[in-house]
Amino acid sequence: MNRLKEKFNTEVTENLVKKFNYSSVMEVPKIEKIVVNMGVGDAVQNSKVLDNAVEELELITGQKPLVTKAKKSVATFRLREGMPIGAKVTLRGERMYEFLDKLIAVSLPRVRDFQGVSKTAFDGRGNYTLGVKEQLIFPEIDYDKVTKVRGMDIVIVTTANTDEEARELLTNFGMPFRK
């Protein structure tokens, strides 16, 4: 069993029940899924760029990404409907906990001038969004093989009803929020 999942079952549930006075343990918010999205705007001109992004995303998450396609045509971007423009991965279960553990313990501390993640990036429904400027913070990415530094969006979807509950859940997992 993953370290974070074990921590959730033992400490986190107990702490949240005490803090929010839940009548049942089943009311405690959980992390439902983590969606990692990498938008590749250069893919319009060069399809090889998208292949590199897909490969890197697969290394980072350990799961094959889904190639996202344009929903509408936009003439100013020379973009047609159905053109591949990015990649995304939805992580659930064991892989989700492994990714979150790696993100909190290894990757985020490797960010340059890191003071913590934003406290205000919650969406009002208990989901947290985090933007990463470069894929090099992940240990699986080899610096010499990177052709272009790319960022990504990481969305942590929880079953929490409020942002306060979600913030407390992530804080208990060890998410380093700014003071």
UniProtKB/Swiss-Prot annotation:
An annotated GO BP: translation
Q: InterPro entries attached here?
A: Ribosomal_uL5, Ribosomal_uL5_bac-type, Ribosomal_uL5_C, Ribosomal_uL5_CS, Ribosomal_uL5_dom_sf, Ribosomal_uL5_N
Citing just one GO molecular function, the answer is: rRNA binding
Q: Which GO terms describe its cellular component?
A: ribonucleoprotein complex; ribosome
Q: Which keywords does UniProt give here? A: Ribonucleoprotein, Ribosomal protein, RNA-binding, rRNA-binding, tRNA-binding
Taxonomically, which superkingdom? Bacteria
Q: What family is this protein classified in?
A: Belongs to the universal ribosomal protein uL5 family.
What's this chain's function?
Answer: This is one of the proteins that bind and probably mediate the attachment of the 5S RNA into the large ribosomal subunit, where it forms part of the central protuberance. In the 70S ribosome it contacts protein S13 of the 30S subunit (bridge B1b), connecting the 2 subunits; this bridge is implicated in subunit movement. Contacts the P site tRNA; the 5S rRNA and some of its associated proteins might help stabilize positioning of ribosome-bound tRNAs.
Subunit details: Part of the 50S ribosomal subunit; part of the 5S rRNA/L5/L18/L25 subcomplex. Contacts the 5S rRNA and the P site tRNA. Forms a bridge to the 30S subunit in the 70S ribosome.
Q: Which NCBIfam families match?
A: PRK00010.1
Protein name as it appears in the record: Large ribosomal subunit protein uL5
Q: Which organism is it from?
A: Staphylococcus epidermidis (strain ATCC 35984 / DSM 28319 / BCRC 17069 / CCUG 31568 / BM 3577 / RP62A)
Lineage, opening ranks? Bacteria, Bacillati, Bacillota, Bacilli, Bacillales
The UniProt gene name for this protein comes to: rplE
